[in-house]
Amino acid sequence: MNTQQLAKLRSIVPEMRRVRHIHFVGIGGAGMGGIAEVLANEGYQISGSDLAPNPVTQQLMNLGATIYFNHRPENVRDASVVVVSSAISADNPEIVAAHEARIPVIRRAEMLAELMRFRHGIAIAGTHGKTTTTAMVSSIYAEAGLDPTFVNGGLVKAAGVHARLGHGRYLIAEADESDASFLHLQPMVAIVTNIEADHMDTYQGDFENLKQTFINFLHNLPFYGRAVMCVDDPVIRELLPRVGRQTTTYGFSEDADVRVEDYQQIGPQGHFTLLRQDKEPMRVTLNAPGRHNALNAAAAVAVATEEGIDDEAILRALESFLGTGRRFDFLGEFPLEPVNGKSGTAMLVDDYGHHPTEVDATIKAARAGWPDKNLVMLFQPHRFTRTRDLYDDFANVLTQVDTLLMLEVYPAGEAPIPGADSRSLCRTIRGRGKIDPILVPDPAQVAEMLAPVLTGNDLILVQGAGNIGKIARSLAEIKLKPQTPEEEQHD
């Protein structure tokens, strides 16, 4: 970036001119790292800390950031401001040191709000679909030559990054409701994909509280802003009269302003028509499977149409859409002869979905695109509280696959809850009489326990939000083949 471009960018956020050094505690998270990446490209001195290196920290170090793989008071020395993720506790030594030194400590969303303040902000919220919809909107705006800045919770595969600094006036960002911090944002346009019970500890277990928080988020829009909302979702339909802002609805419903019809999935692509008010019908080829992704695309098209983006640019972006990391992420197709001696192959797909609705959507997309495949799922429940709160829903959804292998619950810092563990969930599913789940007690046993259930015409879904993504990549690296002790030692 040349000096003139940097000066222009620094003038966008005038209140931050006195800020020189920004320190992130928990910088390795996708959301934190994305904001740090944008600020690094704007010319700020960036430092941060986390417990272990990952691709996010490597990318930031490539940009000149200083990363500490520990949490120590001296890490915040000389920082102008400290940005903290919701996963970091108040007694973290860096947070304590910052307070003692009277260094401002702010949440991630507060910094995102500062980036958005002097740009045309587009915020994408909702229980499911935020990351993919953010990537779709970003792809359309980039295809239209608008050079947006985007900050996403997942890897935007076309760009190879979670976030990118553009020179245009648009900032497109995923808005996180998990800790209610999206209330800091004041966008011009807000998408709400759906609203379901999740992260209920943030909302005192009160669903009405969660719904009101989404209304409060939408009321952060200016009176001339616009809310784009999925009318197929029963909670959104209920809340629409309370929004108090201009709205555009989308969905398969007949009364949607942007309506999806004639949906058909062929392999990994969706084909459908979008009907828009006062516009010609748009026949879409979307390079992403599933009816849920058609809805995500409808939201993106609604925003782009409102902005006046040319239909041809919209269609090009959706047809060439490369998706996001860990969202129906195709990792390869592998011959089974070296794995278990059988002929044929197995496809390997990695997916982040960890709520029953998300898992259900992934299964439906797999069944629609590959109806003849033996559907094998390796599932890792995420959080004991979520497993407890949605136990019956998980049991119902997971019976839809042909074979289920289940890892232990990924705790995400939570203490175990009796009856909300993987062994109990397997027992409940087995009792329903449809499938016989296989409990995998040790991640190191995955390949060994997976091989015997593969038939030679398989689609393997590796599903969950914990460390299971690393397991998926490991399976791809070894091409599903169980490793001998000698091979493991060599690795």
Swiss-Prot record:
GO terms, biological process: cell division; cell wall organization; peptidoglycan biosynthetic process; regulation of cell shape
Pfam family, one: Mur_ligase
Taxonomy, superkingdom: Bacteria
GO molecular function list: ATP binding; UDP-N-acetylmuramate-L-alanine ligase activity
Keyword Cytoplasm: yes
Record bears the keyword Electron transport: no
Predominant cellular place of this UniProt entry's protein: cytoplasm
Keywords on record: ATP-binding, Cell cycle, Cell division, Cell shape, Cell wall biogenesis/degradation, Cytoplasm, Ligase, Nucleotide-binding, Peptidoglycan synthesis
Enzymatic class: ligase
Gene Ontology cellular component list: cytoplasm
InterPro entries, sorted: Mur-like_cat_sf, Mur_ligase_C, Mur_ligase_C_dom_sf, Mur_ligase_cen, Mur_ligase_N, MurCDEF_pg_biosynth, UDP-N-AcMur_Ala_ligase_MurC
Compartment(s) where it occurs, according to its Swiss-Prot or TrEMBL record: Cytoplasm
Listed pathway(s): Cell wall biogenesis; peptidoglycan biosynthesis
Catalysed reaction, written as an equation: UDP-N-acetyl-alpha-D-muramate + L-alanine + ATP = UDP-N-acetyl-alpha-D-muramoyl-L-alanine + ADP + phosphate + H(+)
Residues noted as binding ATP in the record, renumbered to the chain: G126, T127, H128, G129, K130, T131, T132
PANTHER family: UDP-N-ACETYLMURAMATE--L-ALANINE LIGASE, UDP-N-ACETYLMURAMATE--L-ALANINE LIGASE-RELATED
Record family assignment: Belongs to the MurCDEF family.
NCBIfam families noted in UniProt: murC
Entry protein name: UDP-N-acetylmuramate--L-alanine ligase
Organism whose genome encodes this protein: Shigella boydii serotype 18 (strain CDC 3083-94 / BS512)
